[in-house]
Amino acid sequence: MDKLVIKGGSRISGTITASGSKNTSLPIIAATLLTGNGTFTLHHIPDLKDIVTFTQLLHHLGAETTYEGNTLKVSSRNVQSLQAPYELVKKMRASIYVLGPMLARFGHARVSLPGGCAFGPRPIDLHLMAMEKLGATITIETGFIDATIPGGKLQGGHITFPISSVGATGNALMAAVLAEGTTTISNAAAEPEIETLCKFLIAMGATIRGTGTTELEIEGCNTLKAIEFKNVFDRIEAGTLLAAAAITGGDITVNGVEPEQMKAVLKKFVHAGCLVETTDNSITLKSPKKLIPTDVTAKPYPAFPTDMQAQWIALMTQAEGSSHITDKVYHERFNHIPELNRLGAHIEIHKNQAIVHGPQQLSGTKVMSTDLRASASLVLAGLVAEGTTEVLRVYHLDRGYEKIEIKLNSLGADISREKYDEFH
């Protein structure tokens, strides 16, 4: 197993280019299952564990893929298997994205329940509800979602999500583009990742109105075509890199971005005392001498993203005073806090709010990654901690950050990747 060994105390400064978005890559790769007409060429696809897992799932279904230099080519011409097995789905909840495309194209899909799903209210219910609104029959047995279409073809319908869900909106879109008639989606997620998926489907030949809003209208079509497409930048990686500079007192320019998509995050950096300048495709951040404590509330886009909440908590450990961080998307997304406190942070949890008391001099020690964004917060803390920090179980980090230690080292960090035996 890999760990990152971080020698703290270096300023993160320089110029870097953002990677392609993981959260956009996964649904557009899933959308390649909608047609066997040609080969897709997808550019700016990041080299990540989740991308590898997803392409393995496509291979299992019968698709052919090649990946070289951040370009992924996919042909779904020979897809035959309609079952997504637990062995692959358990590695990544986003595997549920294959449900909509397979059901719409083939009339049947059998997808293992993602690991950790319990009966009762759970996020996957929204995906299943959307398929049922389009005429699918859903049964769950022996750990599998079995989806069929009694009428042979999905029918346009009206889908209203009780809460905003990026994943369920994406699945509904991919199913609706091949449905017969018109589908409307109310309270759709409006995140840039969904807007990009809409643009991808439109380029394939779909008709979608309301792109970028919470009300979508889709006219079903009979055939779609393979296309060449460039993925968008990863706004969470970009935000994490900005936070790395801010927490260490550095100055950074991140290229290859769309600042408009990061307005909520950039606004908070300004409130924290940073100087932020933007162009059409770059963000420059200059750190203040003292960080100002800044409260954030994570909510669906265009608000501050839940995927930046953990990194913001790490940053606020160095601010002069107390900050309140509230997560209204995932109320209990605070697994990183005990580990940050092990490094010397002073953070309290009250229900869905973290109270960060700063500034605290952090001291390096061993800490354990628990999930993707929690891992990023520990790396940020390690950059500013005194001494050496070892971040264990970085396979979580590798799921969503492309060569993060190489990028940070190019900006002045001292991070090495080492093997370790977790049981010794």
Swiss-Prot record:
Coiled-coil annotated residue ranges, if any? none
This chain is encoded by the gene named murA
Q: Where does phosphoenolpyruvate bind?
A: 22-23
Which keywords has UniProt assigned to this entry?
Cell cycle, Cell division, Cell shape, Cell wall biogenesis/degradation, Cytoplasm, Peptidoglycan synthesis, Pyruvate, Transferase
Species this protein is from: Pelodictyon phaeoclathratiforme (strain DSM 5477 / BU-1)
Could you provide one GO biological process annotation from this protein's UniProt record?
A: cell division
Q: Could you give one GO CC term from the UniProt record?
A: cytoplasm
Q: What class of enzyme is it?
A: transferase
The protein here is known as: UDP-N-acetylglucosamine 1-carboxyvinyltransferase
Phylogenetic lineage: Bacteria, Pseudomonadati, Chlorobiota, Chlorobiia, Chlorobiales
Instruction: Read off the CDD domains from this record.
Output: UdpNAET (cd01555)
